[in-house]
């Protein structure tokens, strides 16, 4: 499988793993403190062929993803589930994911809207047990996996659902299939 867009990953091990899964070009951020030079490379890549962000499903990976989204408009996102990116010792990273899971993530990329509209209200997430309650975390994980938006806490979930244009009906449908 060939990917035309540049794939942004965190480091060399991620690049090696992704290139074993698909034919592509990558850009490495080399950590969560992305400098202006790296952002400029990503901007140029976005203008020429497009960019897909595929970072580790952890806090530093989310920080990188957020920084890129804030500074480079129109990037696409691919997410690998946390459980699928864990090694036997519990370390999380794209470099630990199965090749098939990397391909799967890259076949289901999503693009946030530049102008996020709020079609979902926080009260809906509370009503559906996604923010408050003993089972909220598990329900968020299920929803995030089904909608392919990456691991999220309650606040991040609301922001992602609105950024990707999901409706209340989409959320209810995904949870019904639980």
UniProtKB/Swiss-Prot annotation:
<dbReference type="InterPro" id="IPR004466">
    <property type="entry name" value="RNase_M5"/>
</dbReference>
<dbReference type="InterPro" id="IPR006171">
    <property type="entry name" value="TOPRIM_dom"/>
</dbReference>
<feature type="binding site">
    <location>
        <position position="56"/>
    </location>
    <ligand>
        <name>Mg(2+) 1</name>
    </ligand>
</feature>
<keyword id="KW-0255">Endonuclease</keyword>
<keyword id="KW-0698">rRNA processing</keyword>
<dbReference type="Pfam" id="PF01751">
    <property type="entry name" value="Toprim"/>
</dbReference>
<keyword id="KW-0460">Magnesium</keyword>
<protein>
    <recommendedName>
        <fullName>Ribonuclease M5</fullName>
        <ecNumber>3.1.26.8</ecNumber>
    </recommendedName>
</protein>
<dbReference type="Pfam" id="PF13331">
    <property type="entry name" value="DUF4093"/>
</dbReference>
<keyword id="KW-0694">RNA-binding</keyword>
<keyword id="KW-0699">rRNA-binding</keyword>
<dbReference type="GO" id="GO:0043822">
    <property type="term" value="F:ribonuclease M5 activity"/>
</dbReference>
<dbReference type="GO" id="GO:0006364">
    <property type="term" value="P:rRNA processing"/>
</dbReference>
<keyword id="KW-0690">Ribosome biogenesis</keyword>
<feature type="binding site">
    <location>
        <position position="10"/>
    </location>
    <ligand>
        <name>Mg(2+) 1</name>
    </ligand>
</feature>
<dbReference type="GO" id="GO:0046872">
    <property type="term" value="F:metal ion binding"/>
</dbReference>
<feature type="binding site">
    <location>
        <position position="56"/>
    </location>
    <ligand>
        <name>Mg(2+) 2</name>
    </ligand>
</feature>
<dbReference type="GO" id="GO:0005737">
    <property type="term" value="C:cytoplasm"/>
</dbReference>
<keyword id="KW-0479">Metal-binding</keyword>
<feature type="domain" description="Toprim">
    <location>
        <begin position="4"/>
        <end position="100"/>
    </location>
</feature>
<dbReference type="InterPro" id="IPR025156">
    <property type="entry name" value="RNase_M5_C"/>
</dbReference>
<dbReference type="GO" id="GO:0019843">
    <property type="term" value="F:rRNA binding"/>
</dbReference>
<keyword id="KW-0540">Nuclease</keyword>
<dbReference type="InterPro" id="IPR034141">
    <property type="entry name" value="TOPRIM_RNase_M5-like"/>
</dbReference>
<comment type="function">
    <text>Required for correct processing of both the 5' and 3' ends of 5S rRNA precursor. Cleaves both sides of a double-stranded region yielding mature 5S rRNA in one step.</text>
</comment>
<keyword id="KW-0963">Cytoplasm</keyword>
<feature type="binding site">
    <location>
        <position position="58"/>
    </location>
    <ligand>
        <name>Mg(2+) 2</name>
    </ligand>
</feature>
<keyword id="KW-0378">Hydrolase</keyword>
<comment type="similarity">
    <text>Belongs to the ribonuclease M5 family.</text>
</comment>
